[in-house]
Amino acid sequence: HERLVGSEMCIRDSLLVEDAAEAMGATWEGRQCGSYGDYAAVSYNGNKIITGSAGGCLLTNSLEDANQARKWSTQAREAAAWYQNEEVGYNYRMSNVIAGVIRDQYNHLQEHIAEKKAIYNRYKEGLKDLPIKMNPFDETKAEPNYWLSSMLIDEEAMCKQVRGETEALYISETGKSCPTEILDAISSINAEGRPIWKPMHMQPMYRMHEFITVNGSGRAKTNAYI
C-alpha cells in the first residue's frame, strides 16, 4: 500500500481493487486486510478461514456502490410488480442459509486463526532442520491469519526440474528435491498437498498481454521469448 501512494496508478486516479480473497483476519501495520482498496473481494470458499463452502463478499465504503452491487446480484430487477430489467443483472446473491453459516463463524474468527497458527508452528518446528522456509512474513508489520501453511525450498536444495502446461518433470538428486517430488511422496502415504498458485499473468490465456506492476507496465515471460 505504501508503494502505491504516489505511484503512476494513483497519479492517474485509478481505482484500487484489493484481492483479499484469503486474508480475512490478517493485518498489516494494524490495519485489516480488505480495507485498503476502493473495493475489496473476500472469499468464503471451502478452504478459507471463514467458509460457506462457496461464495464471497464485496467490501466498499460507498453506500451507492454497495446498493448497485446488491441490485446487480439480484438480477437487476426494478421496483415493479413484474420482472422489469433496465440493466443486465446476475443471480449472484448468497442464499440465506449460507449467509447464516458464514455470519456465525465470524464469532469464532480468532479461534480459527489460533488453530491455523498452531498448525503452521507445528510444521515450522518439524521441518526446521531441512533446507526450506515456511511461508515468510514481516513479523514487525504483518499479522497473518495462517489459513494456509506452505513451504519454500531453498534454491540450492532444488533438484533439476522443468514444468510444462500440465506436467512437471524432475531428476532425483541425493540431498535435493522439488515440489513435484515432494507431492509424489506425500501422495503415496495418502496425505494432501499441492503447489501454490501460478501467477495469473503467466497463465496461457493472459501471458501474451501487458500487465501492471507497482513500477508500471510489464509483460510475462513465455516460450515465445526464449
Regions found by a protein language model. Give the residues of each.
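Basic phosphate/pyrophosphate-binding loop/patch that engages nucleotide-derived ligands
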Residues: R12-L15, G52, C57-Q75, T174-S177, ...
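Hydrophobic residues in well-ordered beta-strands that form the structural core
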Residues: L16-E18, V42, T60, P195
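Single conserved hydrophobic/aromatic residue that forms the stacking wall/gate
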Residues: H1-I11, A142
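Active-site region of PLP-dependent enzymes
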Residues: A23-E29, Y36-M151, H201
